[in-house]
Curated annotation (Swiss-Prot):
Purpose: GTPase activator for the Rho-type GTPases. As a GCM1 downstream effector, it is involved in placental development and positively regulates trophoblast cells migration. It regulates cytoskeletal remodeling by controlling the activity of Rho GTPases including RHOA, CDC42 and RAC1.
Bias (Basic and acidic residues) ranges: 14-47
Changes seen on gene knockout: SYDE1 knockout results in small fetuses and aberrant phenotypes in the placental-yolk sac barrier, maternal-trophoblast interface, and placental vascularization. Placental abnormalities include cystic dysplasia and apoptosis in the spongiotrophoblast layer, decreased or absent vascularization in the labyrinthine layer, defective barrier between fetal and maternal blood circulation, and reduced invasiveness of primary trophoblast cells.
One family name in Pfam for this protein: RhoGAP
One GO molecular-function entry: GTPase regulator activity
SMART domains xrefs: RhoGAP
Taxonomic path: Eukaryota, Metazoa, Chordata, Craniata, Vertebrata
Domain (Rho-GAP) ranges: 398-604
Gene coding for it: Syde1
Region (Disordered): 1-255, 601-654, 675-708
Sites annotated Arginine finger: R436
Organism: Mus musculus
Protein name stated in the entry: Rho GTPase-activating protein SYDE1
Amino acid sequence: MAEPLLRKTFSRLRGREKLPRKKSEAKDRGHPAQRSEPKPPEPEPRVLEGSQAGAEVPPSPETPRSPTRGAYLQSLEPSSRRWVLGGAKPPEEISLGPRTPSSGEPAGEIWYNPIPEEDPRPPAPEPLGSQLASSEPEGPNIQGAAPTSPPTKTSRTKSPGPARRLSMKMKKLPELRRRLSLRSTRTGRDRERTAPAGSVISRYRLDSSVGTPGQASVAGGSRSPRGGYLSDGDSPERPGGPPSPTAFRPYEVGPSARTPPAALWGRLSLHLYGLGGLRPSPGATPRDLCCLLQVDGVARARTGPLRSGPDFLRLDHTFHLELEAARLLRALVLAWDPGVRRHRPCAQGTVLLPTIFRGCQAQQLAVRLEPQGFLYAKLTLSEQQEAPATAEPRVFGLPLQLLVEREQSPGQVPLIIRKCVGQIECRGLRVVGLYRLCGSAAVKKELRDAFEQDSAAVCLSEDVYPDINVITGILKDYLRELPTPLITQPLYQVVLEAMAQGHPSRASLGPEGTRGLLRCLPDVERATLTLLLDHLRLVSSFHTHNRMTPQNXAVCFGPVLLPARQTPSRPRLRSSGPGVTSAVDFKRHIEVLHYLLQSWPDTRRPSDTPDGAVAPYLRPKRQPPLHLPLAGPEVVTRPRGRGGPESPPSNRYAGDWSVCGGDLLPCGRDFLSGPDYDHVTGSDSEEDDDETGEPRGTTDFEDEFDAPFNPHLNLKDFDALILDLERELSKQINVCL
């Protein structure tokens, strides 16, 4: 009778009998959950109830062990009883070991949780005595959580599903963690070393040694794991006590040393020890602080959020920064502002790197922060490099005499000036805005580098540099960066004396007299300035096209060719401010160059302009009006009104000519098919008139404004009016300061 019952019992334990899941597990799992030795059936339910209460598992609907079953087990032979009771595994194997078919669950179900959830909160301390009485005395509890009884098979009677079984496994983690901590030493490192090799704790680092600040230790005298702050630095843990203030040298940047003369190259190791003297306002709550490090205004490193203390905040962070031409190291202390939900600077300090490493490689400084506080840090400079040698100027910034000797250029004029002037005179004399518009900065940088490498190999053709403003910009940059200006101090005084004699007159000075003003200059400067004055005089002769009159040329080149500050021609009675003095000097520069351009002989006047005559403005030749033999009622025109806003460009020359026949106009129907782009753009169409043989008639815009709109009226009439206005506005106005 015993053998069939035993066989049936083991078949249920191993899951070989396929019964309804909820009922079979609730009934059959209660049998092997017994102690390894027979005990009376009465006291064990009480202990089991206490263990279930400690583990926070709801009681089973039916009693796990009845007196009948206990009597049955006692009636068995000792070997059979041990065989029946040996099917239950120890608690350690249930928690740690892999699941086997003898565990009472289906063989094919494997549940794996790589990152367990957080531990549940410990229960109230009232049932602590009953739990300790029912569990084995293995030592004090370090984490402060109430220990639970060893898990048994009866704890799964209410967990038929996999989710419930997984939650029960998660509830066993506090007990497992407690047992592992009791078996190991008290330090975090030994705890990691003695953890089982296959345990989840050691594999996924669930028991971290980095705690939160202010973690209280439990009774028994055992201290909590060593706390620290994780940050961007190399040392996330805080040392024991504050550093000694006497070990750090006070440092504060003086107002006169904020612009150091040199730079620093190398590797800087910065170790932060702490922040002191940051006294919060009375009644203020502690704030989260972080330290931001900047090198020459660029953020390079920062710490994590740190909870500020009453007077001193301990730090232990190390940063390694690569320095390239570094001068200033700035430390910003940022405080969290809950109003705007971001960090705001509350203190800052500056360190001049080139000055602190003179004669040493390491410094321990107490950097003074503004408005309050100190930053205790150690700065170590390693792998210091010498400053790279500055490239020697080959064209820009080189003295004129030295550049001419190096290039051996003909005429004692640098190649860059000859090439730029040649291209401007070839294709830029009729460009509006010459020397006043700026070209592309990137293209200018490319052209500058090309001149620095090899001036003779630079090609300034229109295919390579189509924008003439790039070439004019390079020429002005070169003249501006000369070590000595072309119009020197002696020449400046000579021109001022000539200006004191009266208005420049070619009859009084003559060509040789004006050129004789440059005799005080050296040969190279005299040849270069002569070439530039000839060029500017030629540019001003095309002022009808490029709007570069001698006055405009003097405004553009006066500050470039003359020094920044000249000695005044007569002493002033009283000193003025620096702004007034600079304005007066700037005005004198323009007057000196304007005098030279007006009195300079024009040897290269354009051939289309007669000698001694002023080039006229662009005004179309006045011709008789065109009279068409049209009847009055057959022509419908729309004359332009005198008042009202100007019509848009698309309707500027609008008119209804649909009633006109093809025999009335010489251009025929083609004229009515589209807009007259030739006349709108103001292009020269005199050749077309010569071919057709018809005289080209234009209406005088000034005399016959009320006349009907003429089809041959073009934009040149408007250009003539605009040029007249510009001529009146460009008249010289003498301003006396």
